[in-house]
Amino acid sequence: MKSVRYLIGLFAFIACYYLLPISTRLLWQPDETRYAEISREMLASGDWIVPHLLGLRYFEKPIAGYWINSIGQWLFGANNFGVRAGVIFATLLTAALVTWFTLRLWRDKRLALLATVIYLSLFIVYAIGTYAVLDPFITFWLVAGMCSFWLAMQAQTWKGKSAGFLLLGITCGMGVMTKGFLALAVPVLSVLPWVATQKRWKDLFIYGWLAVISCVLTVLPWGLAIAQREPDFWHYFFWVEHIQRFALDDAQHRAPFWYYLPVVIAGSLPWLGLLPGALYAGWKNRKHSATVYLLSWTIMPLLFFSVAKGKLPTYILSCFAPLAMLMAHYALLAAKNNPLALRINGWINIAFGVTGIIATFVVSPWGPMNTPVWQTFESYKVFCAWSIFSLWAFFGWYTLTNVEKTWPFAALCPLGLALLVGFSIPDRVMEGKHPQFFVEMTQESLQPSRYILTDSVGVAAGLAWSLQRDDIIMYRQTGELKYGLNYPDAKGRFVSGDEFANWLNQHRQEGIITLVLSVDRDEDINSLAIPPADVIDRQERLVLIQYRPK
């Protein structure tokens, strides 16, 4: 009976965090709008080999993540939930692997359930796991690889070992097809310390080639298909998206070595109090095979991405699955022997909630700021933000009432965030970061437009997805579409600032021409170097400028 209650509680937890509130949040640009539009175009065109964005070749990532996103929109429709359905599914599958692997290592159902809840409630997991990017997919394949390698090395027969390594190769192959060759580097680096400490080199060398073969066979059909269709895909993807992005001096998203330290700290909420003890206990018990394996899968990817020049918070998402298992194991030991870490965790959550309440007041219309984040007419959004932090502090306090028994309720600290964050986003943020909001405000003007031009790829993708059209033209800036725009058949999909006046004269009689520009808050739109317009509609950071036939 207790097991049934636990299962009902887990399903209610998943529903409140990962299902019910998702549709209340508009899509963010540039990431969510980009991936939403790529998948929409895949469904509309029926081309499941070559990814396109705004009708242009888009070679920044392989195909598998787009497949899953497309299936999500096919099943649930072109809506906010449909766009995010794929990443939510991947996150829940990863949580299922956490459950299974914890049960496999310790044979403890309660520990497995706690590891799952800790994983799903970690701030970084929830933030990225409900956000339409490709990282939850690669995380699933990496965690699946972690489980597969363990199965292979623990098998007692050659058939079991062979099956485990073949499965490992499939997960690596799907990882390559999701986000590239990092899906090969991370597993290799993660298992080496364990193999070295356990002296299991023989098994690795005897059976490892099976993983290589199954990985190649997994990638080969699509790899050959896209090479035939687009011969320069692999050159661009390997050199630009891997070497330049991560290793060279001009790498994207350059950041210092210590960049991930604050990411790990913030991402570990509401379980931050368990982080030091979990890592220390893992190191202290490094003679235990399972513990050192989890520790290696936590630390090695973190070090690898810290050394790389290009960094983003999403890159280290896979580290938190083994970390959640270490945290759960440590928490149960602490609850029995010394609950100090659990008390510290409760106080951290109280402090975070109270700090958030104070910060919300400071940036509210009633605070001391001359330019508040929320305006007076957005009072309900301020109260939603207060509720988010109040619930965080409340559940932090509740875990202290009987800490040996109530500490798991820290998982409910982000409940307010899950339910209310979509209602608390300030209008000034929505107007710049949520193209759907802009489309709602300007729908009547946008819909009849013969041509739509914009200077932002993220906004262009949002307009294309909302209006169900892929012919948005880039104006002044090419951004990440630069490579696709270089193809001969992309001629006419970019208009420079100097060419716009002539282009306008040539096309004005064909129908309404709409220009959507991103501007600074204090920028005078009358100073823009464009011909006089018939309509100007400013929505804070986005401006609609329209030219009608004459």
Curated annotation (Swiss-Prot):
Tagged with keyword Cell membrane: yes
Catalytic activity: 4-amino-4-deoxy-alpha-L-arabinopyranosyl di-trans,octa-cis-undecaprenyl phosphate + lipid IVA = lipid IIA + di-trans,octa-cis-undecaprenyl phosphate
GO CC terms: plasma membrane
GO biological process: lipid A biosynthetic process; lipopolysaccharide biosynthetic process; protein O-linked glycosylation; response to iron(III) ion
Keyword Cell inner membrane: yes
GO MF annotation terms: 4-amino-4-deoxy-L-arabinose transferase activity; mannosyltransferase activity
Pathway: Lipopolysaccharide metabolism; 4-amino-4-deoxy-beta-L-arabinose-lipid A biosynthesis
Transmembrane segments: 7-27, 81-101, 113-133, 134-154, 165-185, 204-224, 263-283, 288-308, 315-335, 346-366, 382-402, 406-426
EC number: 2.4.2.43
Topological category with respect to the lipid bilayer: Multi-pass membrane protein
Physiological role: Catalyzes the transfer of the L-Ara4N moiety of the glycolipid undecaprenyl phosphate-alpha-L-Ara4N to lipid A. The modified arabinose is attached to lipid A and is required for resistance to polymyxin and cationic antimicrobial peptides.
Recorded family membership: Belongs to the glycosyltransferase 83 family.
Family matches, as NCBIfam families: PRK13279.1
Protein name per the record: Undecaprenyl phosphate-alpha-4-amino-4-deoxy-L-arabinose arabinosyl transferase
Source organism: Escherichia coli O81 (strain ED1a)
